[in-house]
């Protein structure tokens, strides 16, 4: 770990230079040579400082770990206001989670950020103070002194003691029947209903080890992990982008419509072809496309909807249509509140679907079906926090949802959420 040691020594040298006793922000970037095999997630999980946040873009080109919070924000609106107060730092990134309710968030300006973009990496330390940067530099030195060497992540040697679904299968059937009745009566076009599964284990679950296992096997996904403290974390491997913004250029997508995957390429292709031709799944996907376009229309230029694709994952395949446009102004608050929750995770009409979910789902979604990522003045990117799990000591809560439209069958939808949950669940049964 020569690169890390050298980078930290360079940071300390910068902190030993004269720093003014004035308010403000100072960013120290140290080039980080990728000469040795540095596993950023393992290093992050070795530390005893919280919060910890890990994020990897789904094509693998960008990866980041952030450690410690200089300042925290309970909503993306707050975070964007902060960034706009410091326009000289266009690349200053705030990382974290937005809840299913987009007015709630857990976002942070990190003390330390390691970021890899393609073949280049940087270690960044940020100072921020409303009174004295000099004083914050002293705290930053103390922070660096707490860092420890990397330790290998443990295996997931787990014994299940209990399992509970919310709702159970009977409750699920009743819920789907109520939803399809409501749709038939014209009150809703679609509602996305979810199930939470609590898996109890004989010993605590190492959340970072679970994240590492998922990253290894669940390809073509965003990977995200937030450890709130030593026992509580939220993580996932999501196939779905909520949005990516580069200045005013915006990319989003409709990911809706699902069929099982198969390890055999030929059988997987046949399933994918069936998905492309299936009326129910195409209808479900187009509902999401139309809703996204309608929501963005007032804040964007021309909206381009690309042809449908089949996205093949480890356990399932999805229909995806990408949507590209240009914003009238670079504003992540607009992106969040217009796009989240999309019809792919809530339903249509959105407000009525959210009311149905709040009234009838037997658990609170919290971070599930929210979003994970970062914002800066320059750019931003968030994935939808799907295929996700909440870890609380020795309990793992897995989440999975299904889009309910006219003609949905409770048994088929139960099988679909089993397939979706399997992306993470099978990791806990492998060793």
From Swiss-Prot:
One of its GO terms (biological process) is menaquinone biosynthetic process. Its EC number is 5.4.4.2. The active site is at 190 (proton acceptor), 240 (proton donor). The keyword Magnesium applies. Binds more tightly in the presence of chorismate. Pathway: Quinol/quinone metabolism; 1,4-dihydroxy-2-naphthoate biosynthesis; 1,4-dihydroxy-2-naphthoate from chorismate: step 1/7; Quinol/quinone metabolism; menaquinone biosynthesis. It catalyses: chorismate = isochorismate. The keyword Transferase does not apply. SUPFAM superfamilies: ADC synthase (SSF56322). InterPro entries: ADC_synthase, Chorismate_C, IsoChor_synthase, MenF, MenF-like. Optimum temperature is 37 degrees Celsius. At 60 degrees Celsius the mutase activity is completely lost. Its cofactor is Mg(2+). Disruption phenotype: Mutant produces only a trace of menaquinone. HAMAP family: MenF. Catalyzes the conversion of chorismate to isochorismate. Can also catalyze the reverse reaction, but with a lower efficiency. Homodimer. This is Isochorismate synthase MenF. It comes from Escherichia coli (strain K12).
